[in-house]
Swiss-Prot record:
The complex is composed of two ATP-binding proteins (PstB), two transmembrane proteins (PstC and PstA) and a solute-binding protein (PstS). This is Phosphate import ATP-binding protein PstB. The lineage of its organism: Bacteria, Bacillati, Actinomycetota, Actinomycetes, Streptosporangiales. Residues 5-248 form the ABC transporter domain. It is found in: Cell membrane. It comes from Thermobifida fusca (strain YX). It comes from the Bacteria. Its main location: membrane.
């Protein structure tokens, strides 16, 4: 079931360095929110704070709040592993487990958490997840083949199937199409439009045309200056951001004057 994300006053630090400063936003359920901005502006760093993935980097910490349907994901009694089950992540490059079959890749989340599945239960999860990622018809007769044997676009859809297999509420996607060809990119974009019926989706993209095509809401990030932190400049309905932004900085980026 899709959930709402409320972020208030979020600062992200790496050691003493302030990487992202004072971000507040609401991300509505069953919608696609795109983060755009030039390289190094903090959009991917901020994305990782939404499921605590930034914590795998030594010295990373946050100040502020991230609420998932009113539950503070940074509360002392909250397990980061549970947060990452609830808020899944799809990375820039397809990363199926190379030694695992397509079948085992899909249920990897259950195995990593030492959850035993009956064969019938595992079969149901695999088919449901692969259908959800629009991949079932292409691989149903070769589920025992390595995940790495698939094409790049298929591998990325396999990674999406793996993410939705554990039934998250939110899917984070960090430039999921940047390593893919145009046909595979179109397949992923079509899939995103379908997935938003059941999930809250947040996507980082360098491709403004992609943001315009797939998202309902767009957030523009930019650096406050050389050596300064990234900041949220403007967030709003995608059509408005691309046709009538409120901030001059946003307009300059959208029209290609910088970035």
């Amino acid at each position: 079931m899709a959930k709402r994300i409320d972020v208030s006053g979020l600062h992200v630090y790496y050691g003493d360095f302030l990487a992202v400063e004072d971000v507040s936003m609401t991300i509505e359920p069953r919608s696609v929110t795109a983060f755009i901005g030039s390289s190094g502006c903090g959009k991917s760093t901020f994305l990782r704070t939404l499921n605590r993935m930034h914590e795998v980097t030594p010295g990373a910490r946050v100040e502020g709040k991230v609420l998932l349907d009113d539950q503070d994901i940074y509360a002392p009694d909250v397990d980061p592993v549970e947060v990452r089950r609830e808020v899944g992540m799809v990375f820039q490059r397809p990363n199926p487990f190379p030694t695992m079959s397509i079948y085992d890749n899909v249920i990897a989340g259950y195995k990593l958490n030492n959850r035993r599945l009956r064969k019938s239960e595992a079969d149901e999860i695999v088919e449901r997840s692969l259908r959800g990622a629009n991949l079932w018809e292409e691989v149903k007769d070769r589920l025992d083949r390595p995940g790495a044997s698939l094409s790049g676009g298929q591998q990325q859809r396999l990674c999406i199937a793996r993410a939705i297999a554990v039934e998250p509420s939110v899917l984070l996607m960090d430039e999921p199409c940047s390593a893919l060809d145009p046909i595979s990119t179109l397949a992923i974009e079509d899939l995103i439009s379908q997935l938003k019926e059941n999930y809250t989706i947040v996507i980082v993209t360098h491709n403004m045309q992609q943001a315009a095509r797939v998202s309902d809401v767009t957030a523009f990030f930019n650096l406050a200056g050389t050596g300064k932190p990234g900041k949220l400049i403007e967030i709003g309905e995608t059509n408005k951001i691309f046709t009538k932004p409120e901030k001059k900085e946003t307009e300059n980026y959208i029209t290609g004057r910088f970035g």
